[in-house]
Amino acid sequence: MLAGLDLDSIFSSLLSRGGECGELFFEEVRTLSVLLEDGRVERVLEGTDSGIGIRLVFREKTYYAYTTDRAGDAVLSLARDLSRYAEGGGVPVSLPASPTMAENPSPVRVPPSTRGIAEKVELVRTMDRVARGASRSVRQVRATYGEAERRIEVAYHPGVFAADRQTFTLLTVQCVAGNGSGLTMGYETGGGTAGWEFLEEVLPGTLAEKAAGRALRALSARRIEGGRMPVVLSSEAGGTMVHEAVGHGLEADLARRGMSVYRDSLGTRVGSPLVSIVDDATIPGKRGSFGIDDEGSPGRRTLLVSDGILRGFLYDRLLARKEGVPPTGNGRRESYRHRPIPRMTNTVILPGTSSPEEILRSVDRGLFVRKMGGGQVNTVTGDFMFEVAEGYRIENGRQGEPVRGATITGNGPEALGMIDRVGDDLGFGLGTCGKEGQGVPVGDAQPTLRFGPPFLTVG
């Protein structure tokens, strides 16, 4: 789409009074969502949104505007308006003549737009039917299907003109169970960057069974006695801890502003020698994967922590330029209405050599976490608190009775240092990460982990 505009005139106007960089970002997104609640299809929404964002950076300040009018005159007028924030002489424009299409790590075999609404409604009906069939104690079921087909083009001075297509599919199911002792909830989700073929791996009935089972088991669960104790995080728990307690602190903008516990730790030990962490946008099919980020930088695998030593941060183009380092492909934005900022993609603690069964057997008494819930993190201090959505007592090296209402508190670098067993498995989670009012799709992953002395605090 951008190739159809007079980019030379637009960029010449944008940079007519100077600027370190200028950018045009085009986005077109088609979305469809289906919501089923209380046994009824409540909503089927389909729509398309498109627009162009324009960015000017002058003396390290960012000026941003956007328009839904894709006509060349409208974009040129907006570029002229932004140029008024600069003061100085013009900048010679250097751009390729046409965009380079990114090599996407998740090629789509069956675009979801080629399948009918009835098939998509049947997916949520299946989740509702399976969840309710698990037990009469299942009181409520909320099931959703979502898809998005996103096309982006990025023209970035100096020297970048790139394009990408990204397809997302997602199923979620939430179950509420109840008896005389109260109400409990179970939640499960599945999907990623894939077309309709995602159903080869993500089975609606299986998601519903897991969500209903989690809610039902919680009905008979008891609270655990609090205190410091060994904690085993199953790979099934997903990477909530690495994303929240570690990943945000490694986004370069937070570190640069002094808002990260890791701000002065590059090259120093921040965790156990058993811990290595990467951020990887190139993993096929995962929710945080892409061919290019929202500044036109290729998606890549970035080493963050190697054998417990902090090796790097996550950069967008602007911060990388300020610090004299290469961008890491982490400049992301929610839409054309937003400026890009450093964000995670798929953040992963790499697998080790211990079997999950061996790790569990190594603990006499403690807490075994199968699913993490929500939580809070102070990125400045590294302190965190997470809820446990599904947990069990560890009794004599075995999974014991379920617990409810448990929390885990600790500190990011201290917790990484407590990891003394790392499993040879790997489990992925997915979600939408919020930061500065923007939500972007992300993935996270971890193997089974054991947190040893001085132990996390369980509440």
Question: Model-found features: residue ranges?
Answer:
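N-terminal small-residue-enriched
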Residues: 1-459
